[in-house]
Regions:
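Conserved strand-to-loop "acid loop" that flanks and positions the catalytic carboxylate
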Residues: 239-246
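The conserved beta1-alpha1 loop
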Residues: 24-30, 54, 113, 242
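Conserved alpha/beta-hydrolase
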Residues: 40-78
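Conserved alpha/beta-hydrolase "acid-adjacent" motif
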Residues: 247-257
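Catalytic active-site module of serine/aspartate enzymes centered on a nucleophile-bearing elbow/loop
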Residues: 264-300
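Flexible "cap/lid" loop of the alpha/beta hydrolase fold
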Residues: 135-179
Length: 300
């Protein structure tokens, strides 16, 4: 089995592989498909196919601002971004295309982390018949009351989350992106980033996580509506991986999103797996998360 980044499973896959589950893994904000590598490796070693999606202009297509490379913050505040104008329709199209290809070879389990949850909901609406299971890993799951990632973030249940607003470079409205400087050398900014992303990680692992982060995320992705419809998204079996020390999507907000989703589809509620010590990026050891994801292959 092979790992892929941003590419669907081959439609020419041999018949003996047909029926095996493909996991389609969707990264979160300011990230890339490579975020999933430790978990994907575990799943592949257990006999599954895995696709680690790169959303448009992320990962292998990443935009690296010239000013970011040389750490010129004045220039970085105004350098145009090709991510401006991208939105959830683009993200949905990317993931849906991969799901369509993967589904030719067998069942698909779609998993989203963080902002990747809004793509899971949109794709669940678009192609529910192609999805064996959907999973939100400390991810946004919008509802009628909280229809966007922005609305979820602003909910009172997210009050104890760490906001990156003071790390923002430039004007998001003018740039069309939320731009963050992950190469900062300012100790206070690094401490804020660590608390937001992975407070429980050793510093060396924190720096490794930062090295994979991308400066720009389009503001339209946060503002796009992603409420699953009852007759489409609402009929796909679903799981939530709840992280108890998340300072980006607070645990109380995760609980509210789970409760509102379950209230909308009482006959198809979340199966919740609790990781009480996990920060936003999840446990440093990928095995416990992979253990849960592995079980989804057999669940309808």
């Amino acid at each position: 089995m092979a790992l892929a980044t941003g590419l669907g499973a081959s439609p020419a896959a041999a018949d003996p592989r047909r029926g095996l589950v493909t996991y389609v893994l969707v990264h979160g904000t300011h990230s890339a498909g490579a975020f999933w590598t430790p978990i994907a490796r575990e799943l592949v070693l257990r006999g599954h196919r895995v696709v680690m999606v790169d959303q448009p202009r992320h990962g292998a297509e990443a935009f690296v601002a010239e000013s970011y490379q040389r750490q010129d913050l004045t220039a970085m505040a105004v350098e145009p971004s090709p991510l401006k104008g991208l939105g959830l329709a683009d993200y949905e199209a990317r993931v849906t295309g991969i799901v369509r290809q993967a589904a030719r070879n067998g069942p698909v389990v779609l998993v989203g982390h963080s902002l990747g949850g809004v793509s899971v909901s949109r794709v669940g609406d678009a192609v529910p018949h192609l999805l064996h299971h959907i999973c939100y890993m400390a991810a946004f799951c919008p509802s009628r009351a909280l229809p966007t990632a922005d609305a979820c973030t602003a909910a009172p249940e997210n009050a104890n989350a760490v906001s990156p607003v003071e790390l923002t470079v430039g004007d998001p409205d003018r740039l069309g992106v939320l731009r963050l400087n992950f190469r900062t050398g300012v100790s206070g900014e690094l401490a804020l980033l660590k608390e937001m992303i992975c407070a429980d990680y050793p510093d060396a692992d924190f720096r490794r996580i930062l090295a994979g982060m991308q400066t720009d995320e389009p503001v339209a992705a946060y503002a796009g509506r992603a409420v699953g419809r009852l007759g489409t998204w609402g009929r796909v079996p679903r799981t939530y991986l709840r992280f108890g020390r998340d300072r980006t999507i607070a645990t109380a907000l995760q609980d509210r999103m789970i409760a509102e989703a379950d209230a909308s589809t009482p006959g198809n509620c979340f199966r919740v797996h609790d990781f009480p010590g996990a920060s936003h990026v999840g446990p440093l050891d990928p095995t416990p998360v992979a253990d849960v994801l592995d079980t989804l292959a057999g669940r309808g």
